[in-house]
Amino acid sequence: MRSARFRLPTSRLARLVYASVILTSVSLVSIFHARPRVWAVDAVPVAFWAWRTQSPNEVDVQAAVEKAKAQVLFLRASQIDYQDGKLRRIRPFTGSLPKGIKLHLVYNTTRPVLEQLESIDPQTLAAEITRAYGEDSERAKRDGADVKGLQLDIDFPTRLLPRYAQTINALRPQLQPHTEVSITGLPTWMDSPSLNSVLQSVDFWVPQFYGGEIPTHFSQTVPISSPESITYFVNKARQLDKPFYAGLAAYSVALLYNASGSLISLRGDMNPALITSDANLELIDQRSFSSAERRYAFRARANGVTDGLNMRAGDVLVIDLPSSETLRVAARLVRRMAGKKLLGICVFRLPVSDDPATLTVEQVTDALNDHDSSPAIYVRVKRQQQSNNTHVFALEFKNGGAASPIMGSLKVDLIVPAGSFEGITAGQDVSFQPLCAASGPRPCSERRADLLRLTIDFLAPGQTLTTTLLLNRDLPATTGVSVAMQTETEQSYSAHNEIPIEAGVK
């Protein structure tokens, strides 16, 4: 049997039509596979997500606006709880709503609601959320705040996403016209066909590009976010073709495992400094991930409490610390791959002065501006009230930069008169070694030492530590200080300065 041969059309019109079809097909294929336009650094709007009962103060919000150029704030308004078969609003925010920034009020649910989502009527849930939003909108008017919309932060199981769509559709008609409705999105939803129906019900969404996998056993080493997971999630979000803010993490996560390695609890609000300085916790492991995120593991020596967390002897507390570089890498990937439906980057969480678990606003700003995280360790020496013949000095160490030292790598050398050392009140997070500077610093007795080396376990950006130095004679007007450390990006940093001895308490 003779094989069939393909022949081009013979007429001129047919050839033109055929060529047009081929060109159109090639164009469509090219468009489908074309790489998205890369966003310029300064072209991506910035938003923050605030999740505390207390409304953020004006100073912290203004810092985010002025330094990070924040335009939008997603602010926790309250939770919806389920008790005795009824839904009710609990834990409403306290304080005045911030002005000078566009607000979206966020509502989530308690665990009892999540456990009953399959049986709770979507209309009833929508009505309770609408009632809470109405009350909060009136408060916003009195506070002079600019509320643009409502956001739902409800962790519906993937199989129940159709009920989430029903809830949002029931919510819409109860809101004022032009109210923007959005949701946060879990990484586990990305591959569900049901997600499309949810997204059709909202104006935009904020998918979380982190926390896609929780390490349920101590042996698992899973970062909060990784370049690989962010690449996957950003590509999925772009393909869904719905306007979105890219949700990026800027806070540490602490995970408590029992002695057998099973996960007990997870917290995102623990103070890393309290963990590293706890004498009951023994550092047993530290490692870095590819994007300068670091993981530290501590074993509890005995039963105890650290930053409100109860631990038993043998439990292991793991803390994953992001860095400015972690966020920088994530933001760079978003700008490169998000495409035209990107509305901006939403940083989880808003930096505030009393939240040591979150990156500082300076760290976030450097990251979003694609700047290197610069180290800056400042040392101050202040004279204190003299006790008998003992001269007392307060030593203050402050991390004023955007880079953290790797735990245990920060060393500060302070020159003192030979033989003057009497004592130092170093805490668990500060240790010291007496040195003799001649012929290169080398260990020597305290009575001969003319150089004190202080090793600081942990000093995060924005953190300040103070310790007390006792000498048997006064310091001169100035003294030499040397600082050396390894940053979380494993870069070496060193500096030497002549600093003045400041007047203190007489």
Identify what each model region corresponds to.
Residues 418-453:
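A surface/secretory-pathway sequence property marking extracellular, secreted
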Residues 389-406, 414:
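Asparagine-centered strand-capping/turn motif at beta-strand->loop junctions
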Residues 56-83, 136-147, 337-341:
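Catalytic domains of carbohydrate-active enzymes, especially glycoside hydrolases
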Residues 39-53, 78-201, 207:
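Chitinase-like catalytic core of GlcNAc-active glycosidases
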